[in-house]
Amino acid sequence: MPVAMPVAMPSAPPLLIRHATLPDGRTGMDLLAEGGRFTAVGPALPAPAGTEVIDAQGWLLSPPFVDAHFHMDATLSHGLPRVNVSGTLLEGIALWAELKPLLTEEAIAERALQYCDWAVARGLLAIRSHVDVCDERLLAVRALLEVKRRVAPYLDLQLVAFPQDGVLRAPGALKNLKRALDLGVDVVGGIPHFERTMQDGADSVKLLCELAAERGLRVDMHCDESDDPLSRHIETLALHTQRLGLQGRVTGSHLTSMHSMDNYYVSKLMPLIREAGVHAVANPLINITLQGRHDSYPKRRGMTRVPELLAAGVNVGFGHDCVMDPWYPLGSGCMLEVAAMGLHVAQMTSLQGQRQCFDAVTVNNARILGLEGYGLTPGCRADAVLLQARSPEEAVRLRAQRLLVVRSGSVVSRMAPAVAELRLPGRPAHVDFTRQAAPPSIETAR
């Protein structure tokens, strides 16, 4: 694939965003960005000479959205070479195997770049993408490494070496995974529940955690993406995380078998996950779609135990996982849609639960990726998204418009407000779907 030079972001003058509401509830706040960082936050800040000033008009200014689990090598490939008729995880894997021989670096890169455009417009400025290494050519690896380089000025792309067909099960997978890491892939991935036996799955976890420890890398494994309550590789992942001193650097993604596990066993498992400092990622849109496909009724929701993990002290993030690919025909890079689905599936409709779901696509995911300088305090990177909402809860409810997206102090995307014009006698001329009355506080709400 021809190598294109990345286009650097132009040097930006100071940027002052006035009259913003922050996720912690503070209103009338100004944020000054200089040299790609926030240098001051507070009310009525003075504007240095030459500053671009933007009036937030009281709308919610948030750190950008972060996606902790995605498959960019497959994104926007829906219908190639056919569609997933059953809608199951296994047919999706089989369909991906049919598609892989037909892929080119150029096609993978072009689809990925288009998706990154969507992401920026959605205020999604950091993505962790798994990339399949079970291909001797490593086409997807090479394509996404090039995409990572090209989008670096405006989006942080973190890549996981993912042995889709099993690192022990697929011939050459371990060698290819190491090659991918040598080329510059950031994170060690795995899929223990897809190995031939439970023992092979456990062995793969040990092997891959040791590899990550040797190389000083993070770990993110597809773990127990199954309806089988006996799929318990997360406990092995937590064990080796502690043994190797990888606390805070390891993520268990999906963990859907926990939905079906015995409650007593889970009561022992959750403290182990917390003590090991293992992050958990649920993928609400995909878990509710793929899990429980073979159930009659009642059908399992399939998503892992999000509120219980949070209550146990585990850092939980949400991922989009798929957009228009062999596993999922829908999606558009909207992390607020992900948060809203997670809220519904986990029945987290309290004000606290709604806020936790917003955090699961922002600050929690930033911790999972280990993002430096994430936030809205002085010294943080001047990355932010202005949402047409007055609170995080309202942003989730409305899947709020991204009025403004800022990267390193430069505006990289603008979107018109969502406003409907009404022609009703005696009623307002416009509605934007925000509630005008003050909402109840968390303390007084039921």
Annotated model-derived regions:
Residues 20, 36, 58, 69, ...:
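Divalent metal-coordination and catalytic microenvironments
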Residues 139-153, 170-279, 295-318, 374:
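Histidine/acidic residue-rich metal-binding segments in metalloenzymes
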Residues 76-108, 184-187, 208, 233-251, ...:
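Active-site gating loops and adjacent loop-to-helix segments of metal-dependent hydrolytic enzymes
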Residues 218, 239-250, 286-290, 300-387:
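His/Asp/Glu-enriched, well-ordered alpha-helical/loop segment
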Residues 95-110, 160-171, 192-199:
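Active-site mouth loops of central-metabolism enzymes
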